[in-house]
Amino acid sequence: MKKLILLISFILFSFTSFAVKIENNEIVDKYGNKIEAREYKRIIVTDPGVIEILFKIGGEKSIVAIGKTTKSKIYPYEKVEKLQSIGSISNLNLEKIVEYKPDLVVVSSMMLKNVESIKKLGYKVIVSNASNLNEILELISVVGVISGRKNEAEDLRKVSSLKLEKIIKENHKKSSNLKGAILFSTSPMTAFSDDSLPGDVLKHLGVTNIASNVPGQRPILSPEYILKENPDFLAGAMSLDSPQQIIEASNVIAKTKAGKNKNIFILDSSLMLRSSYRIFDEMEVLK
Protein backbone atom coordinates (compact mmCIF):
# COMPACT_ATOMS: atom_id res chain seq x y z
CA MET A 1 0.00 0.00 0.00
CA LYS A 2 2.84 2.36 0.89
CA LYS A 3 4.47 1.67 -2.47
CA LEU A 4 1.22 2.50 -4.28
CA ILE A 5 0.80 5.79 -2.38
CA LEU A 6 4.35 6.82 -3.23
CA LEU A 7 3.75 5.97 -6.89
CA ILE A 8 0.55 8.03 -7.03
CA SER A 9 2.29 10.95 -5.32
CA PHE A 10 5.10 10.77 -7.86
CA ILE A 11 2.69 10.79 -10.79
CA LEU A 12 0.76 13.77 -9.40
CA PHE A 13 4.04 15.64 -8.84
CA SER A 14 5.07 14.95 -12.44
CA PHE A 15 1.93 16.66 -13.71
CA THR A 16 2.84 19.89 -11.88
CA SER A 17 5.94 20.37 -14.02
CA PHE A 18 5.78 21.19 -17.71
CA ALA A 19 7.99 21.64 -20.73
CA VAL A 20 5.39 23.16 -23.04
CA LYS A 21 1.65 23.46 -22.50
CA ILE A 22 -1.57 24.99 -23.79
CA GLU A 23 -2.89 27.73 -21.52
CA ASN A 24 -5.50 30.44 -22.21
CA ASN A 25 -5.38 29.86 -25.98
CA GLU A 26 -1.60 30.15 -25.93
CA ILE A 27 1.23 27.65 -26.12
CA VAL A 28 3.77 28.39 -23.40
CA ASP A 29 7.15 26.77 -22.80
CA LYS A 30 9.08 26.59 -19.53
CA TYR A 31 11.39 29.41 -20.67
CA GLY A 32 8.55 31.92 -21.01
CA ASN A 33 8.17 31.85 -24.80
CA LYS A 34 4.55 32.16 -25.95
CA ILE A 35 2.74 31.67 -29.24
CA GLU A 36 -0.91 31.58 -30.26
CA ALA A 37 -2.43 28.10 -29.93
CA ARG A 38 -3.39 27.51 -33.58
CA GLU A 39 -2.34 25.68 -36.72
CA TYR A 40 0.94 26.75 -38.38
CA LYS A 41 1.60 25.98 -42.05
CA ARG A 42 5.39 26.37 -42.31
CA ILE A 43 7.25 24.91 -39.34
CA ILE A 44 10.97 24.44 -38.89
CA VAL A 45 11.69 21.71 -36.31
CA THR A 46 15.01 20.89 -34.65
CA ASP A 47 13.62 18.51 -32.01
CA PRO A 48 13.80 14.90 -33.34
CA GLY A 49 10.98 13.83 -31.01
CA VAL A 50 8.61 16.47 -32.39
CA ILE A 51 9.47 15.41 -35.95
CA GLU A 52 8.58 11.81 -35.10
CA ILE A 53 5.29 12.89 -33.51
CA LEU A 54 4.40 14.99 -36.56
CA PHE A 55 4.85 12.01 -38.88
CA LYS A 56 2.89 9.72 -36.57
CA ILE A 57 -0.17 12.00 -36.52
CA GLY A 58 0.02 12.89 -40.21
CA GLY A 59 1.24 16.44 -39.64
CA GLU A 60 4.47 16.22 -41.64
CA LYS A 61 3.10 18.48 -44.41
CA SER A 62 3.56 21.43 -42.06
CA ILE A 63 7.34 20.83 -41.93
CA VAL A 64 9.40 23.04 -44.27
CA ALA A 65 12.82 22.10 -42.85
CA ILE A 66 14.45 20.35 -39.90
CA GLY A 67 17.64 20.18 -37.88
CA LYS A 68 19.44 16.97 -38.86
CA THR A 69 21.08 14.53 -36.44
CA THR A 70 24.72 13.55 -36.84
CA LYS A 71 24.57 10.04 -35.37
CA SER A 72 21.18 8.44 -34.74
CA LYS A 73 18.47 8.71 -37.39
CA ILE A 74 14.99 10.17 -37.01
CA TYR A 75 11.98 7.93 -37.60
CA PRO A 76 10.54 7.29 -40.20
CA TYR A 77 14.09 7.23 -41.56
CA GLU A 78 13.57 7.26 -45.34
CA LYS A 79 10.92 9.99 -45.24
CA VAL A 80 12.86 12.22 -42.82
CA GLU A 81 16.03 11.99 -44.91
CA LYS A 82 14.16 13.68 -47.77
CA LEU A 83 13.35 16.79 -45.69
CA GLN A 84 15.26 20.03 -46.16
CA SER A 85 17.92 20.88 -43.56
CA ILE A 86 18.75 24.14 -41.76
CA GLY A 87 21.80 22.62 -40.04
CA SER A 88 22.25 20.20 -37.17
CA ILE A 89 19.97 19.86 -34.14
CA SER A 90 22.54 21.74 -32.05
CA ASN A 91 23.86 24.30 -34.52
CA LEU A 92 21.38 25.79 -36.97
CA ASN A 93 22.01 28.12 -39.88
CA LEU A 94 20.14 31.40 -39.35
CA GLU A 95 20.40 32.28 -43.05
CA LYS A 96 18.61 29.04 -43.89
CA ILE A 97 15.79 29.94 -41.50
CA VAL A 98 15.26 33.20 -43.38
CA GLU A 99 15.33 31.31 -46.67
CA TYR A 100 12.46 29.00 -45.65
CA LYS A 101 10.26 31.78 -44.21
CA PRO A 102 8.69 29.75 -41.36
CA ASP A 103 5.66 30.88 -39.43
CA LEU A 104 6.95 28.87 -36.43
CA VAL A 105 10.29 27.44 -35.27
CA VAL A 106 10.24 24.56 -32.77
CA VAL A 107 13.60 23.89 -31.12
CA SER A 108 14.89 21.56 -28.41
CA SER A 109 16.78 22.78 -25.34
CA MET A 110 20.02 22.15 -27.26
CA MET A 111 19.13 25.27 -29.27
CA LEU A 112 18.53 27.63 -26.35
CA LYS A 113 21.48 29.76 -27.40
CA ASN A 114 19.75 30.48 -30.71
CA VAL A 115 16.28 31.36 -29.43
CA GLU A 116 16.86 35.10 -29.06
CA SER A 117 18.56 35.30 -32.45
CA ILE A 118 15.54 33.62 -34.06
CA LYS A 119 13.20 36.05 -32.31
CA LYS A 120 15.24 39.02 -33.52
CA LEU A 121 14.67 37.81 -37.07
CA GLY A 122 10.95 38.21 -36.39
CA TYR A 123 10.00 34.55 -36.15
CA LYS A 124 7.85 32.85 -33.53
CA VAL A 125 9.74 30.21 -31.55
CA ILE A 126 8.89 27.63 -28.89
CA VAL A 127 11.18 25.27 -26.96
CA SER A 128 9.98 21.66 -26.69
CA ASN A 129 12.07 20.37 -23.81
CA ALA A 130 10.34 17.33 -22.25
CA SER A 131 12.26 15.89 -19.30
CA ASN A 132 9.70 13.30 -18.19
CA LEU A 133 7.02 11.04 -19.65
CA ASN A 134 4.05 13.20 -18.68
CA GLU A 135 5.65 16.16 -20.44
CA ILE A 136 5.90 14.04 -23.60
CA LEU A 137 2.16 13.34 -23.37
CA GLU A 138 1.48 17.08 -23.14
CA LEU A 139 3.88 17.72 -26.01
CA ILE A 140 1.90 15.32 -28.21
CA SER A 141 -1.20 17.49 -27.67
CA VAL A 142 0.73 20.67 -28.44
CA VAL A 143 2.13 19.20 -31.67
CA GLY A 144 -1.41 18.29 -32.68
CA VAL A 145 -2.54 21.90 -32.29
CA ILE A 146 0.33 23.52 -34.22
CA SER A 147 0.01 21.03 -37.10
CA GLY A 148 -3.78 21.11 -37.35
CA ARG A 149 -3.96 17.43 -36.36
CA LYS A 150 -5.52 17.82 -32.94
CA ASN A 151 -7.81 14.77 -33.09
CA GLU A 152 -5.02 12.50 -34.31
CA ALA A 153 -2.72 13.81 -31.59
CA GLU A 154 -5.28 13.17 -28.87
CA ASP A 155 -5.70 9.61 -30.16
CA LEU A 156 -1.93 9.11 -29.96
CA ARG A 157 -1.82 10.64 -26.49
CA LYS A 158 -4.57 8.30 -25.31
CA VAL A 159 -2.81 5.22 -26.69
CA SER A 160 0.50 6.30 -25.12
CA SER A 161 -1.20 7.02 -21.77
CA LEU A 162 -2.82 3.59 -21.74
CA LYS A 163 0.53 1.95 -22.40
CA LEU A 164 2.03 3.87 -19.48
CA GLU A 165 -0.86 3.00 -17.16
CA LYS A 166 -0.52 -0.68 -18.05
CA ILE A 167 3.20 -0.62 -17.30
CA ILE A 168 2.60 1.04 -13.92
CA LYS A 169 -0.04 -1.53 -12.95
CA GLU A 170 2.13 -4.47 -13.99
CA ASN A 171 5.14 -3.18 -12.09
CA HIS A 172 3.03 -2.67 -8.97
CA LYS A 173 2.30 -6.40 -8.99
CA LYS A 174 5.98 -7.34 -9.09
CA SER A 175 7.61 -8.33 -5.81
CA SER A 176 11.21 -7.86 -6.95
CA ASN A 177 12.81 -4.42 -7.03
CA LEU A 178 15.66 -4.10 -9.50
CA LYS A 179 18.50 -1.63 -8.99
CA GLY A 180 20.47 -0.16 -11.82
CA ALA A 181 21.56 2.90 -13.77
CA ILE A 182 21.56 4.28 -17.28
CA LEU A 183 25.06 5.56 -17.95
CA PHE A 184 25.88 8.74 -19.86
CA SER A 185 29.64 8.17 -20.04
CA THR A 186 32.39 6.00 -18.55
CA SER A 187 35.27 8.45 -18.12
CA PRO A 188 34.26 9.53 -15.58
CA MET A 189 31.35 7.15 -15.07
CA THR A 190 28.27 9.37 -15.06
CA ALA A 191 24.60 8.40 -15.00
CA PHE A 192 21.24 9.99 -15.71
CA SER A 193 19.58 11.45 -12.62
CA ASP A 194 15.98 10.96 -11.48
CA ASP A 195 15.13 14.36 -13.01
CA SER A 196 16.05 13.23 -16.52
CA LEU A 197 13.91 11.43 -19.09
CA PRO A 198 15.82 8.12 -18.68
CA GLY A 199 15.53 8.53 -14.90
CA ASP A 200 11.78 8.96 -15.22
CA VAL A 201 11.59 5.82 -17.35
CA LEU A 202 13.36 3.86 -14.60
CA LYS A 203 10.86 5.16 -12.02
CA HIS A 204 7.87 4.10 -14.08
CA LEU A 205 9.43 0.69 -14.68
CA GLY A 206 9.74 0.22 -10.93
CA VAL A 207 13.55 0.31 -10.99
CA THR A 208 15.63 1.94 -8.25
CA ASN A 209 18.07 4.33 -9.90
CA ILE A 210 21.37 4.01 -7.98
CA ALA A 211 22.26 7.52 -9.18
CA SER A 212 19.36 9.04 -7.23
CA ASN A 213 21.47 9.40 -4.07
CA VAL A 214 24.29 11.20 -5.87
CA PRO A 215 23.97 14.99 -6.45
CA GLY A 216 24.05 16.62 -9.87
CA GLN A 217 22.23 16.39 -13.18
CA ARG A 218 24.87 13.93 -14.39
CA PRO A 219 25.89 12.18 -11.13
CA ILE A 220 29.40 10.74 -11.06
CA LEU A 221 29.40 7.14 -9.81
CA SER A 222 32.68 6.27 -8.12
CA PRO A 223 33.95 2.65 -8.16
CA GLU A 224 33.39 2.46 -4.40
CA TYR A 225 29.81 3.65 -4.75
CA ILE A 226 29.01 1.22 -7.55
CA LEU A 227 30.42 -1.67 -5.53
CA LYS A 228 28.39 -0.62 -2.48
CA GLU A 229 25.15 -0.26 -4.46
CA ASN A 230 25.78 -3.56 -6.30
CA PRO A 231 23.39 -2.87 -9.24
CA ASP A 232 21.42 -5.64 -10.94
CA PHE A 233 22.11 -4.05 -14.31
CA LEU A 234 24.01 -1.23 -15.99
CA ALA A 235 22.81 0.22 -19.29
CA GLY A 236 24.68 2.57 -21.58
CA ALA A 237 23.38 5.38 -23.79
CA MET A 238 24.59 8.50 -25.62
CA SER A 239 28.25 7.97 -26.68
CA LEU A 240 28.36 4.44 -25.28
CA ASP A 241 27.85 1.84 -27.99
CA SER A 242 29.34 -1.33 -26.49
CA PRO A 243 28.87 -3.18 -23.16
CA GLN A 244 32.63 -3.69 -23.18
CA GLN A 245 33.13 0.05 -22.66
CA ILE A 246 31.24 -0.24 -19.37
CA ILE A 247 32.96 -3.46 -18.29
CA GLU A 248 36.43 -2.03 -18.94
CA ALA A 249 35.67 1.31 -17.27
CA SER A 250 36.37 -0.07 -13.77
CA ASN A 251 37.52 -3.38 -12.32
CA VAL A 252 34.64 -3.26 -9.82
CA ILE A 253 32.02 -3.76 -12.55
CA ALA A 254 32.79 -7.48 -12.77
CA LYS A 255 32.24 -7.79 -9.01
CA THR A 256 28.67 -6.46 -9.11
CA LYS A 257 25.53 -8.48 -9.81
CA ALA A 258 25.33 -6.73 -13.17
CA GLY A 259 28.81 -7.93 -14.07
CA LYS A 260 28.48 -11.44 -12.67
CA ASN A 261 25.17 -12.02 -14.45
CA LYS A 262 26.35 -10.29 -17.64
CA ASN A 263 23.46 -7.87 -17.34
CA ILE A 264 25.26 -4.98 -19.00
CA PHE A 265 23.79 -3.66 -22.22
CA ILE A 266 23.34 -0.66 -24.53
CA LEU A 267 20.05 1.18 -25.02
CA ASP A 268 18.97 2.86 -28.23
CA SER A 269 19.41 6.56 -27.45
CA SER A 270 17.02 7.51 -30.25
CA LEU A 271 14.28 5.75 -28.27
CA MET A 272 15.26 6.55 -24.68
CA LEU A 273 16.37 10.17 -24.93
CA ARG A 274 13.83 11.75 -27.29
CA SER A 275 10.56 13.54 -26.59
CA SER A 276 8.80 11.03 -28.81
CA TYR A 277 5.80 8.71 -28.50
CA ARG A 278 8.21 5.86 -29.38
CA ILE A 279 9.58 5.86 -25.84
CA PHE A 280 6.35 4.25 -24.62
CA ASP A 281 6.80 1.44 -27.16
CA GLU A 282 10.35 0.89 -25.91
CA MET A 283 9.18 0.76 -22.31
CA GLU A 284 6.79 -2.05 -23.21
CA VAL A 285 9.82 -3.99 -24.47
CA LEU A 286 11.96 -3.19 -21.41
CA LYS A 287 9.33 -4.04 -18.79
Place the predicted regions along the sequence by residue:
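Sec-dependent N-terminal signal peptides
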Residues: 4-13
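Proline-aspartate-enriched helix->loop->beta-strand connector
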Residues: 93-107, 123, 222-236
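Bacterial Sec-exported substrate-binding components of ABC uptake systems
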Residues: 15-51, 150-181
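Short helix-initiation/N-cap motifs at beta->coil->alpha
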Residues: 30, 84-95, 214-223
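Structured C-terminal subdomain patch of bacterial secreted/periplasmic proteins
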Residues: 137-145, 152-159, 165-171, 233, ...
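A short, structured surface patch at a secondary-structure boundary
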Residues: 45-100, 104-110, 210
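Extracytoplasmic ligand-binding site segments that recognize negatively charged/polar headgroups
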Residues: 129-142, 181-197
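Alpha-helical, coiled-coil/dimerization segments enriched in small aliphatic residues
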Residues: 70-72, 190-218
